[in-house]
């Protein structure tokens, strides 16, 4: 079954972001999506972390992501408590705003030494927020055979609010979808996957 009408994509967290965005960009390839706590409403899921990451960089890594990366390479193992949040933000920047003049390096949405917002780069991030992408890609979303969204009401990154905001945009654009909010946080939600996969299978199977 090679056609897009029989191909769906699902993911959680950053993978949930991809599950929302890839079908918008490639409706020729995918005909349904399921997103579990996908990154959305960037001003809530990313922006609040910038000050604490700037502090961590200042206090532990000389205000430099390069120093963070060098220290990580030399560490005997990956210490999530020490490296995780800052490294994740660096990875997001590599994905959203890669530096065309420095392959493998990002353009950062804030000054790592002070935390001061770089408005130009931040606006480029916001342009990639699923909530803001919904309207310009409404036709692609409207072509989906199934759109399923869920998130925990106690998600630490406020991705329940992101899912709700994306859902509200879909409703405003008259795009059919399902949103389920449940009691839970960001982790420990893999039990939600089978139900979403079942919905995709039912929508993508041969009639």
Language-model segments: which ranges?
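Non-catalytic cap/lid and distal C-terminal segments of serine-dependent acyl enzymes
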Residues: 1-207
